[in-house]
């Protein structure tokens, strides 16, 4: 148990699988100080992937269902496999269960890479399984509880730009 918990998810189970697999098949816990990213992974080569983040307040992931729906939408928009929401929900809970820091509001992040680059020899030998990282961190920058001031601004392009220029991926982070 720790104040920083890092798990590598089973991409085959968490993306494209059906139902919830046994806990041992969902995530593998690793030392957060150890290097774990494969140099041939598209997240390292091109930043190719999707992510979500939320606060876990006193053991409860805030709006997790909405964050996982948005993760699914992001996956669809970039032609990645569909996430297995029940399995991801369980995997998140397994990570939370390993957390034991007194900080009540650590940051939870789910990072999903497209997997190994198929244009490399290593990637050609592997299947196109997403790489999934889930971590909880009480030692990083946490959400402020202070009130904020917001302003509404234009993004500098028309609201219908997505229909005319879908390659912009406008709305991937709704």
Task: Give the ranges of each region predicted by the language model.
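Ordered, amphipathic secondary-structure segments that act as subunit-interaction surfaces
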Residues: 92, 97, 101-112
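Helix-start/capping segments and mature chain N-termini
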Residues: 1-86, 90-94, 113, 121-174
């Amino acid at each position: 148990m720790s104040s920083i918990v890092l798990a590598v998810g089973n991409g085959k189970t968490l993306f494209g699988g059906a139902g919830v697999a046994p806990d041992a098949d969902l995530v593998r816990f690793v030392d957060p100080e150890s290097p774990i990213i494969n140099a041939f992974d598209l997240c390292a080569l091109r930043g190719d992937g999707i992510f979500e983040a939320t606060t876990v307040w006193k053991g409860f992931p805030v709006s997790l269902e909405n964050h996982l729906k948005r993760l699914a939408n992001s996956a669809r928009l970039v032609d990645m496999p569909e996430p297995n929401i029940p399995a991801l929900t369980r995997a998140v809970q397994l990570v939370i269960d390993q957390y034991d820091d007194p900080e009540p509001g650590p940051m939870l992040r789910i990072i999903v890479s497209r997997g190994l680059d198929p244009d490399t020899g290593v990637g050609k030998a592997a299947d196109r399984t997403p790489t999934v990282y889930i971590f909880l961190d009480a030692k990083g920058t946490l959400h402020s509880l202070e009130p904020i001031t917001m302003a509404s601004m234009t993004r500098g392009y028309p609201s219908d730009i997505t229909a005319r220029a879908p390659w912009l991926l406008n709305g991937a982070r709704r």
